[in-house]
From Swiss-Prot:
This is Tol-Pal system protein TolB. Residues 1-31 form the signal peptide. One of its GO terms (biological process) is protein import. SUPFAM superfamilies: TolB, N-terminal domain, Tricorn protease N-terminal domain. It comes from Bartonella henselae (strain ATCC 49882 / DSM 28221 / CCUG 30454 / Houston 1) (Rochalimaea henselae). It is found in: Periplasm.
Length: 443
């Protein structure tokens, strides 16, 4: 896929301020949202996403996916197309801003789709600041017809980034465990799909038990555990695009929660010892050399690297019940950072480095929360019967996790770091243990 810039009429930076999003003033729209993205008491920004002009239905489809991405973020309110007072027939012409101001749209998205002679699609879009009466963004994309959804996600990322000051996360994938069958004979398959639930593909056939899939932070590659005949643990690498699977280790004892290092060159995992303890090890993916990081009679597990690769966070019951600890990447400077009541598990470092997400069990309830890397500022985002396994969007502002309700199978949910906009992700069957990919358009 090739991308080229058309024209951007202006670019500027404004000091972050607090604005009410419901006051439809002439203040540029992206300034208004940047000031409130980290708070939980703001209203979504009204935006008009017009049907992209095309000779067939592809323009309508692209616009629909763009609008759905923006709406699902909780930061935008796509306006009903029935309210539009202007029909955009020429996307290269400046819109009549008073019409869009009348319906209180603060942002306006227009576009067109042209089929090139070689069969590719050329997709152009423009983002307008309605009250500033200026173009914020203009981009052109070329892609194969079957990849039109990716272009839609990339356009949504451009809009999200321009209007919030944060990186987008729509052009991403989710790997997870698809679950079917009765509880005493559960069939679990590795599955992957776009972040909105589209383009579902099964990676495994259900003949082996698969657990804890995790994306590389640098490539479209995953690591996961598989138990052949439910007995012998294997750790695999799988290249998503080519479908190639590589065995990186077979272990006599149980292996728990393999995860990539921040540079994608190592895998860190917990290995069960003969005395019942579990310690953390890394494996260099080039040399296959194993390095032991912890030595304890307790259970150390669920390790995750900081974005710069210098720190590791993990869960351990060395103090009596599972708590969260950090240490240097070489195993030195061990510190406990969780200090409140309850048991803590599945910690994972934000891609931005500013938060660690976790699962917390207290008084029979399971919560998803975040804290700073020093343990300060703990906040619970959602609590329920059984919430578990947070994973970060690549922009570090949205979390995904899975939830089991009484008498029901697991489902996948998203929530932002303010604790708002909790939503269930559509999956064909029960689904657990999700992991979020890096952005596809930077691969």
């Amino acid at each position: 896929m090739m991308i080229m810039t058309t024209r951007t009429f202006f670019s500027w930076f404004i000091v972050i301020c607090a604005f009410w999003l419901t006051s439809f003033s002439s203040v540029p729209v992206h300034a208004q949202l940047k000031g409130t993205i980290s708070t939980a008491d703001f209203n979504p920004i009204p935006i008009a996403v017009t049907d992209f002009f095309s000779n067939d239905s592809i323009g309508l489809k692209i616009a629909a996916v763009v609008a759905a991405d923006l709406e699902r973020s909780g930061l935008f309110l796509p306006l009903d197309k029935a309210s539009f007072l202007e029909k955009i027939s020429n996307p290269n012409r400046q819109p009549h801003f008073p019409y869009w101001q009348e319906i209180k749209a603060q942002g306006l998205v227009i576009g067109q789709v042209i089929r090139e002679n070689d069969g590719r699609l050329r997709v152009d879009f423009r983002l307008w600041d309605v009250f500033g009466q200026r173009q914020l963004k203009g981009r052109r994309f070329y892609t194969a017809t079957e990849r039109w959804r990716r272009v839609a996600h990339m356009i949504a990322d451009e809009i999200y980034s321009e209007m919030t000051g944060e990186s987008g996360y729509f052009d991403t994938r989710i790997v997870f465990i698809d679950e079917t069958g009765p509880q005493n004979a559960r069939i679990k398959r590795l599955a992957i799909m776009d972040q909105d639930g589209a383009n579902l593909i099964y990676i495994s056939d259900g003949s082996e038990l698969v657990l804890t899939p995790r994306f590389s932070p640098k490539r479209q590659e995953i690591t996961y555990m598989a138990y052949e005949h439910n007995q012998v643990p294997h750790v695999y690498l799988q290249q998503i695009e080519m479908g190639q699977r590589e065995l990186i280790g077979t272990f006599n004892n149980m292996t728990i929660a393999p995860r990539f290092s921040s540079d994608g060159q190592k895998v860190i995992m917990s290995l069960l010892q003969n005395d019942g303890s579990a310690n953390l090890y890394t494996m260099d993916l080039r040399t296959r050399m194993m390095t032991r990081l912890t030595t304890t009679s307790a259970i150390d597990t669920s390790a995750s690297y900081s974005p710069d690769g210098t720190k590791i966070v993990f869960s351990s019951d060395r103090s009596g019940k599972p708590q969260i600890y950090t240490m240097n990447a070489d195993g030195s400077n061990l510190q406990r950072i969780s200090s409140n009541e309850g048991s803590y598990s599945t910690p994972i470092w934000s891609p931005r480095g500013d938060y660690i997400a976790f699962t917390k069990q207290l008084e029979g309830q399971f919560s998803i929360g975040v804290m700073h890397p020093d343990g300060q500022g703990e906040r619970i985002l959602t609590t329920g019967f059984h919430n578990e396994g947070p994973t970060w969007a690549p922009n570090g502002r949205v979390l995904m996790f899975f939830r089991k309700n009484p008498g029901m199978g697991p489902k996948i949910y998203t929530i932002d770091i303010t604790g708002r906009n909790e939503r269930q992700l559509p999956t064909p069957n029960d689904a657990s243990d999700p992991a979020w990919s890096p952005l596809l358009n930077i691969q």
